[in-house]
Structures are given as structure tokens and as C-alpha cells.
Amino acid sequence: MKAKIVPEKTNLHPRNLHKFGYDFEALTTCSSELKNHVFTNEYDTQTINFSNPEAVKALNNALLIAYYNIKNWGIPQDYLCPPIPGRADYLHYIADLLATTNNQIIPEGENVIGLDIGIGANCIYPIIGNAIYDWSFVGTDIDEKAIQNCKKIIENNPKLIDAISLQQQVESRFIFKNIILTDDKFAFTICNPPFHNSAAEATKSSARKVNNLQEIRTKNPVLNFGGQNTELWCDGGEIGFITQMIYESAKYPMQVLWFTTLVSKRENLSSIYKTLNKVSAVEIKTIDMAQGQKNSRIVAWTFLSELQQKAWRF
């Protein structure tokens, strides 16, 4: 008997290609590897074990083939393997944000350039942004191995070669310095900042995630989405990273239309707003997002007046 495919109630952006959940029957036709991980649960629904990193990688690979025409995608072991629907949501909300300064028309094409802070080894944001909106990207990271893996993904997909450029941040204490150069113009920046304050905190969180998914305890938790140290934690955690980003952004007020970042912890918003006011941000927006049971938000800010925003040319 064929398993039922029940669309999830995801609360994703209306344009999100994944808003009806995962059609595993269709996805397994794209990836034999994924087929090995799909099973029918007690609710007679097809699914995978989301606490298994290899299963999540196989799902991502199938999604990238089926929806974004990306071949030979892969990441090294223990690197962040992000849930694609949530990453796509961020970009759809960025598109809506750009439309507010473009007569409510979403700007598309290679002249819309985004800066991905912390691209990781997966290259997900530029892949999705280019596939859906034909945007161009500069991706940065302090991790040379992550940059090299993104380079491999791009080389495996010739359509990405002219759309995505990569730059390693050689001074890890900086975010925009060395990256935004004198003549650069970016329509937006995106960032999924390190969440935790320390490696110990990251490990504890990973154990909790696995327990929630598997309903078992383990002494050596496997991160269901992986993650290197630089992806998961930094001194000061999320609020420390975002605070530094805000102060640095003030040095490039005319070169970026919208600076943005994900904010996982709602309690950090008050401090973020105070810092943005300190650096005299002209406009601040908070965009709520939801994926299943997980709630997050984007904070966006600009140093451009309304007239300057309207005059921006993509």
C-alpha cells in the first residue's frame, strides 16, 4: 500500500516552493540516495530521520536538483547542512523588502547584488537567490575549507560561475572590512549569525535537538544539521556578532541599500534596536518568519533616506 503524502502546515512565505511540505515520492526520483532514507512513519506518512545528517544531506541534494537545477551538490562532513525551505524564506522576504523601494516591483537580474556574510560550505543562499530571482552574489567566510567547497559547487554548475564570487575574510575579527571595497554597491546583505556563546553551549543545544528528534539520550550527540565552530558559536554569541555587524555597517552607509541579519533570539531585539539608534540608522524593519514550530525574524536597516532609497538603481 502506497504511503500517504500529507502536506505540512509550514507557514512559509507564499512564494516559497516548499510551502506544501516535502513530496518524498517525487524527490526520490531525483535521488536514489534519498530513497534509502525514506520510510513510512506511524501516521502512514513518508518522512526521513531528521536527526541523521546523511539523511538531511540527501534531502537537500534532492531538493536542489528538483527545484533549483543544481547538480553534484555536497558538503564536507560536520559542516552546516541547512534546511532549504527556511533559507528560501529569508530570500523571499528580502525580495519583498527590495520591492518597497522599487515601486512594489521585485527587482530581478544580475545587477541585483547580494552579500552573503558567512556563506559556509553549502552556498545555499546564493544558489537559491540566483535560481529564483537571477541575483548575483558575493559570498564570504573566514573558513578556507568552506570557501573551497563553495568553489567546487559553483564549478559543478556552470550557470553559477558568473553569478557567484567568493572571498575569504582574512581578518576574522572583521565582518565587512576587506569585503566591501570602495566602488562596491550591494542591494542587500544577508547573514545567519553564530547562535551560541561557546562550544560547550553549542554541544548542549545539539544534544537537546537530538533528544527532541529521537526521544533518546546520547553521550555524543550528532548535530542533525552539522556545523563547524565558526558556524555555531563566537564570543558574545548572536548578540555580540550582530552588534559588531551594526557598528561596522555604519562605515559603509552609501554602499548598501539594506543591511539584514537573521535574529533567532527575540530577547536580543531590544539591544539590537538600541545599537541601530546609536549608529543613526535611518530606517529599521523587523520581519517575522515561521517554519513549522520554529519562529525567527529578520532585522533590516538602512542609512539611506527615503529619497535615496527610491533613487537606488539595481
UniProtKB/Swiss-Prot annotation:
Keywords: Cytoplasm, Methyltransferase, rRNA processing, S-adenosyl-L-methionine, Transferase. One of its GO terms (molecular function) is 23S rRNA (adenine(1618)-N(6))-methyltransferase activity. GO terms for cellular component: cytoplasm. Its main location: cytoplasm. The keyword Plastid does not apply. GO terms for biological process: rRNA base methylation. HAMAP family: 23SrRNA_methyltr_F. This is Ribosomal RNA large subunit methyltransferase F. It comes from Flavobacterium psychrophilum (strain ATCC 49511 / DSM 21280 / CIP 103535 / JIP02/86).
